[in-house]
């Protein structure tokens, strides 16, 4: 059968998906430089890819979690608690890194009179209220809106209910999960084309000229994210596994982080992470819950963004910050980051919440948000890559640690 394939298809089958994505990336950059108008046109391909991922992710999570819980065998254990602990420690550590970096390399902003016309949450209570309302959302509405907290709540509830169903019903759920997984694999195979379109259109439309004025701020932001990805996260993985963490860290960055960087959506990257966990041979009943949960609450990148931009505003306005206040900012940024997925605009719109800690007026804070949108081409991409790859990394570390303990 394979001998009947066209030579181009044979080459495609022999080339790894990561290499295909890299080729798509280079092709997108080349097209944007040579023919910007054509590059704008192929942006449609990238939009289709992201839309396909976003479309399949809610259904995948709903079916997979429900099937995993319904088919759970008595005596089996999931390892969610240690993963949640790593999520919380990782997010708080990221906020601390951002505070230290902001003190060491203070950034200044050029604040204009224009502010983004967006409505930030009124306080941490409103963020928590939004999360609670998301939990009790209508299941159909949750699937339509991509509300993964609501999807998880209903999937877990129905999964426990189906534990008492007939073997045939449980088998049907398992078959549905396999069917959706097959569709996801097909969508992920389109990643090289999607990233080609996204990169070409983004560079043709924005370029990097708009970013040069905020180069120092971007270096601090991306530097913090790299430090967390390559130092803090490996330290947490070593704490769990007691062995060299870097092979696993680099695998997650390569397999999950690259795709997340270009899709700029943790939700869209859920299918990629689930497939990565499957390839790593992890415990399905654990990763089917921890990955979508991580896409909602594991927000190390968001904590860095909130902290660095808030500290930049504080430095620009000449506000003195003592150590206790900086620690309080870390806690506030960590809690706010966990609610970033429940706020339209994500981490950037939670900046006014952190700015309020220093008495910065909302008008000024929204100007900082506007700057965040200007640098979003890099900031949002790096943030999503860190967030999403960390979901897979911590899940893998916890599952492997449990396997070592039982061995």
From Swiss-Prot:
Membrane topology: Multi-pass membrane protein
Membrane-crossing segments per the record: 16-36, 44-64, 83-103, 142-162, 180-200, 212-232, 301-321, 331-351, 358-378
Functional note: Involved in the import of serine and threonine into the cell, with the concomitant import of sodium (symport system).
This protein's GO CC annotations: plasma membrane
Major location (coarse): membrane
Disulfide-bonded cysteines: none
Key word ATP-binding present: no
Molecular function via GO: neutral L-amino acid:sodium symporter activity
Locations listed in the record: Cell inner membrane
Catalytic activity, as annotated: L-serine(in) + Na(+)(in) = L-serine(out) + Na(+)(out); L-threonine(in) + Na(+)(in) = L-threonine(out) + Na(+)(out)
Gene3D superfamilies attached to this UniProt entry: Sodium:dicarboxylate symporter (1.10.3860.10)
Keyword terms of this UniProt record: Amino-acid transport, Cell inner membrane, Cell membrane, Membrane, Symport, Transmembrane, Transmembrane helix, Transport
Family from the record: Belongs to the dicarboxylate/amino acid:cation symporter (DAACS) (TC 2.A.23) family.
InterPro entries: Na-dicarboxylate_symporter (IPR001991), Na:dicarbo_symporter_sf (IPR036458), Ser_Thr_transp_SstT (IPR023025)
Name of the featured protein: Serine/threonine transporter SstT
UniProt GO BP: serine transport; threonine transport
Keyword Lipid metabolism tagged: no
């Amino acid at each position: 059968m394979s001998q009947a394939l066209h030579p181009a298809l044979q080459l495609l089958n022999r080339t790894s998906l990561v290499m295909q994505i890299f080729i798509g990336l280079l092709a997108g950059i080349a097209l944007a430089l040579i023919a910007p108008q054509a590059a704008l046109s192929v942006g449609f391909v990238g939009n289709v890819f992201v839309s396909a991922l976003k479309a399949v992710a809610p259904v995948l999570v709903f079916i997979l979690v429900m099937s995993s819980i319904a088919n759970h065998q008595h005596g089996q254990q999931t390892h969610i608690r240690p993963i949640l602990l790593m999520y919380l420690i990782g997010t708080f550590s990221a906020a601390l890194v951002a505070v230290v970096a902001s003190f060491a390399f203070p950034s200044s902003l050029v604040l204009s009179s224009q502010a983004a016309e967006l409505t930030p949450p009124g306080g941490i209570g409103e963020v928590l209220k939004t999360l609670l309302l998301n939990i009790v959302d209508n299941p159909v509405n949750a699937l339509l809106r991509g509300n993964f907290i609501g999807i998880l709540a209903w999937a877990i509830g129905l999964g426990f209910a189906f534990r008492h169903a007939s073997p045939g019903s449980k088998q049907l759920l398992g078959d549905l999960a396999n069917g959706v997984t097959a569709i996801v694999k097909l969508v992920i195979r389109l990643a090289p084309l999607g990233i080609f379109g996204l990169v070409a259109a983004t560079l043709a439309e924005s370029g990097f000229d708009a970013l040069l004025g905020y180069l120092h701020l971007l270096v601090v932001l991306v530097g913090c994210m790299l430090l967390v990805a390559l130092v803090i996260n490996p330290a947490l993985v070593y704490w769990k596994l007691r062995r060299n963490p870097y092979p696993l860290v680099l695998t997650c960055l390569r397999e999950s982080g690259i795709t997340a960087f270009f899709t700029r959506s943790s939700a869209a990257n859920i299918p990629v992470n689930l497939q990565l966990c499957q390839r790593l041979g992890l415990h399905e009943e654990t990763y089917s819950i921890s990955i979508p949960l991580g896409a909602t609450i594991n927000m190390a990148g968001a904590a860095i963004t909130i902290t660095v931009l808030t500290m930049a505003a504080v430095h620009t306005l000449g506000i003195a910050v003592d150590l206790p206040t900086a620690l309080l900012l870390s806690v506030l940024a960590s809690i706010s980051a966990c609610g970033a997925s429940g706020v339209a605009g994500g981490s950037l719109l939670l900046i006014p919440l952190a700015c309020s800690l220093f008495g910065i007026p909302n008008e000024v804070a929204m100007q900082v948000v506007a700057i965040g949108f200007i640098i979003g081409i890099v900031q949002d991409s790096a943030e999503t890559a860190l967030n999403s790859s960390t979901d897979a990394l911590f899940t893998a570390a916890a599952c492997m640690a449990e396997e070592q303990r039982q061995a």
